[in-house]
């Protein structure tokens, strides 16, 4: 198949591109710059210059292809709600092109749309009300599943790890370096699920090839890692004290990260593994943190 990939130059998207090409697919990748276009060409893909905001150009690219994997997202947490609204508009535009074609569309969401109260979330768990902003993209995706699009959702955990990661864990490491301590909130027993980037990319490819319209998949290799353990490994690697901060102190210490660090989001992928035959095999988060990939 000829697959249109948004975020093709990203941390996860670039690995998806590699695996799609390895599986014999053609890739047309949405990229913003000539620099990223050159990288995509070198990998064997075809660059398509555009942005998420330019929906007309995006739709023309989608129309050339047999399916879509949408991973791009504006990761600017100062405008998070607007980024989620843009994500929904992008999915709407893609869905309009694919409507009635029975072509596959895999969109990206997050496990945090599920409850953050420590209850194990599954692929069939109900989303709590009111939903978080990221749920907008899920609602839009599922709408097209009943309109002749093989649309499904792949939820990523807060920690998609591996060499080149620049998300929450590297941010925590930078906070620890700047503060001289590695901290967690309260007793630190709230959990984040995790997955290695290579395993996550593999799930996108499997979902593209095997998915059923309206499905939700979880790219989760580890159901829940206590934040205290993550902070402990960071402290060990940086040779700095590991401390607890109160919820009142958390915002001053972590900034915007405090709201994410307070989430208790254990998540299962048992149904995903059963339905798609997905088996995560790569290193765990703590193994990666013990290596030189992050330090």
Swiss-Prot record:
A GO cellular-component term linked to this record: cytoplasm
Disulfide bridge partners, by residue number: none
InterPro entries recorded: Epimerase_deHydtase (IPR001509), NAD(P)-bd_dom_sf (IPR036291), NAD(P)-dependent_oxidoreduct (IPR051783)
GO molecular function: aldehyde dehydrogenase (NAD+) activity
A Pfam family this chain is assigned to: Epimerase
GO biological process terms held by the UniProt record: cellular detoxification
Homology family: Belongs to the NAD(P)-dependent epimerase/dehydratase family.
Name of the featured protein: Uncharacterized protein C2A9.02
């Amino acid at each position: 198949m000829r697959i249109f990939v948004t975020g093709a130059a990203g941390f996860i998207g670039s690995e998806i591109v590699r695996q799609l090409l390895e599986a014999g697919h053609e890739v047309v990748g949405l990229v913003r710059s000539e620099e990223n276009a050159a990288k995509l060409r070198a990998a064997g893909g075809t660059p398509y210059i555009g942005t998420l905001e330019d929906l007309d150009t995006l739709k023309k690219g989608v129309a050339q292809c047999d399916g879509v994997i949408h991973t791009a997202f504006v990761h600017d947490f100062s405008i998070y709600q607007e980024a989620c609204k843009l994500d929904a508009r992008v999915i709407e535009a893609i869905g309009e092109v694919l409507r009635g074609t029975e072509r596959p569309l895999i969109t990206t969401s997050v496990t945090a749309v599920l409850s953050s109260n420590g209850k194990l979330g599954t692929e069939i768990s109900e989303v709590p009300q009111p939903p978080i902003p990221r749920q907008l993209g899920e609602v839009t995706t599922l709408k097209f599943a009943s309109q002749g699009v093989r649309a499904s959702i792949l939820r990523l955990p807060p920690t998609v790890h591996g060499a080149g990661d620049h998300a929450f864990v590297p941010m925590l490491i930078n906070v620890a370096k700047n503060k001289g301590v590695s901290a967690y909130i309260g007793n630190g027993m709230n959990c984040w699920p995790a997955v290695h980037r290579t395993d996550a990319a593999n799930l996108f490819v499997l979902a593209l090839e095997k998915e059923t319209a309206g499905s939700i998949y979880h790219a989760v290799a580890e159901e829940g890692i206590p934040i205290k353990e993550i902070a402990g490994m960071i402290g060990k690697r940086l040779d700095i004290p590991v401390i607890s901060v109160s919820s009142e102190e958390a915002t001053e210490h972590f900034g915007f990260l405090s709201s994410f660090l307070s989430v208790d989001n254990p998540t299962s992928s048992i149904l995903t593994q059963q339905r798609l035959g997905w088996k995560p095999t790569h290193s765990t988060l703590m193994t990666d943190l013990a290596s030189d990939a992050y330090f």
